[in-house]
Amino acid sequence: MSKIGLFVGTTTGKTEEAAEKIKEEFGGDDVVTIHDISEASPEDFDGYQNVIIGCPTWDVGELQSDWSGFYSEELDNVKFTGKKVAYFGTGDQIGYADNFQDAMGILEEKITGLGGTTIGSWSTEGYDHEDSKAVKNGKFVGLALDDDNQADLTDERIKEWVKQLKTEFGV
């Protein structure tokens, strides 16, 4: 089994594409296994001490549909105590400036309440948004990606974030 479980939901494919880039930056299948949250069960989290959650913000500050279903039906049954959890999200900071990356913040708050330890916070510098549920103590709770307005920064952001996570995960 790989060292990191990456659980992702996607509608347009952008979040899944980012997940693949994150996996490759870590070193591929030997290190990261990607799980589609629409097909995942709470038991799929059991084998991992290191977890990455990937979710786009959908509509106006909402969870993407696959995550919404898992959130309401399954998330409370995941044993997060003792797990390090990193988050990344995709969104549009210009079109949805008042709720950029809210889904990441919604999931982080819930998972922290279930015992997960958040790692991988990310600076808000270089972003142009008004508000976000994903900002705590002046930083995003995880990596914020915006392929609608800053696609040219995505690869470098992923590279830097994974470098940070390798240290924080201890892998």
Swiss-Prot record:
Any Pfam family hit: Flavodoxin_1
TM region(s), chain numbering: none
PROSITE patterns, sorted: FLAVODOXIN_LIKE
Signal peptide: none
Residues annotated as domain Flavodoxin-like: 4-166
Function statement: Low-potential electron donor to a number of redox enzymes.
GO molecular function, one term: FMN binding
PANTHER family: FLAVODOXIN 1, FLAVODOXIN 2
Keyword Flavoprotein on entry: yes
Taxonomy, superkingdom: Bacteria
Cofactor: FMN
Designated name of the protein: Flavodoxin
